[in-house]
Amino acid sequence: MTATGTSVSLLKFVGTVSLGLLTGVSYSISSLALPALLRLPSSASASHGLSTLSAALKTPVLALTSLASAPFLISFFLAPRSSRHPYLLYTAILATLSSVAPILIPTPTPAPRRTASSAPRKSSRAKMEASYEVLGDAHSEPASDEDIEDINGEEVRAEVEGLTRSYLARTAISALGFAMAVVGIWGDGAPQSVVYVS
């Protein structure tokens, strides 16, 4: 095997493993991590968890997508003309398309958030002084919705469900590419027999 043949085989291996990891990570996010956010006790903690998870996933998912698509493209162009199988190009396109899938899938638009009331709020000192006055009062009312900055749980649920759908689409596309890569590599390694007909 020549140096080019070895490097092409190595590139195919790296691309296939990266595509398999991308498929597994996308599936784990859509089936385990995102549904767990909906079971958090408050919508504020779910919203914070969603933003933290989204920010933490951008770099690894982009790296896996790049490591999945670039080796297949490079191996397609480095391979000798007789070994340039179209599955290399198709797999690279599917890996790239899996990163674009979340943009293409429509997400439900949450209703606009309620703006805070225009009435001036009490200063923190005034709130503290008022809390001493009603400390022993059994009939005191809890803080109103205006006093507590609240995040709508339905908005968070819509965001989580939209992100889950996009990661499921990413999983499906990358799984199709992974299956194509495995079958293609298996076909590359199959012994080629030449039959002469006389």
UniProtKB/Swiss-Prot annotation:
Positions with biased composition (Basic and acidic residues): 126-142
Membrane topology, record value: Multi-pass membrane protein
InterPro entries: ATG33
GO cellular component: mitochondrial outer membrane
Location in or out of the cell: Mitochondrion membrane
Keyword annotations of the record: Autophagy, Membrane, Mitochondrion, Transmembrane, Transmembrane helix
Compositionally biased tracts (Low complexity): 112-121
Disulfide bridge map: none
Annotated transmembrane regions: 17-37, 60-80, 86-106, 171-191
GO biological process: autophagy of mitochondrion; macroautophagy
Region described as Disordered: 111-147
Protein purpose: Involved in the selective degradation of mitochondria via autophagy during starvation and at post-log phase. Autophagy is required for proper vegetative growth, asexual/sexual reproduction, and full virulence. Autophagy is particularly involved in the biosynthesis of deoxynivalenol (DON), an important virulence determinant.
Family: Belongs to the ATG33 family.
Annotated protein name in UniProt: Autophagy-related protein 33
Organism field: Gibberella zeae (strain ATCC MYA-4620 / CBS 123657 / FGSC 9075 / NRRL 31084 / PH-1)
Gene that produces this protein: ATG33
